[in-house]
Amino acid sequence: AGIENMIVTGYTDVDHMWNMVKLEGKWYHIDVGWDKPSAALSERYPDMVLYQYFLSEDSIMENNLIISNMLCDPPVADSSDMYYFNVENKYAETYDQALEIIEQSCRRCIDSGEKYFMIKLDSSNLYLQTTSDLIKPDSEGVTDIDRIVRSLNFKGQISYIDYYKAYRIIIFVLE
């Protein structure tokens, strides 16, 4: 029993092609080409995958391209049920939720030896608040990221890359 799928085309500045798959009766986009990080990140973290376009819905694809399939009429993909950031509990709608996800994900990385994780934020405002407030010292000079590091007894360093600002994704690196 195979998975129903199709090739879809569209364009930004150039023509582009990716896949759609049908899982549990709903269609999703998968674009492994656009989920590949930049050359600099790939060199440092060769196994990194971004997951922005993994089991995503139309609205995410349409942020960056125009779907104009010449091969077939693509079905509607309007479910986020299997979207990576939802399934992995890496999607935050508030700053407090983002802090909780960051702390839990740091703990998982420390326990497993993984070097990085990603979270996606609900809005551009939350993205800006998170990237700002994480490193903003309070009246005692302590930042939220410092609090997380201390609470986990982590002896290394946690940094973040706001590499995917347009998509509201932050990559955290533990070293």
Where do the language-model regions lie?
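Hydrophobic/aromatic-rich core segments of domains that either
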Residues: 1-55
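N-terminal accessory/pre-domain segments preceding catalytic cores
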Residues: 24, 47, 52-175
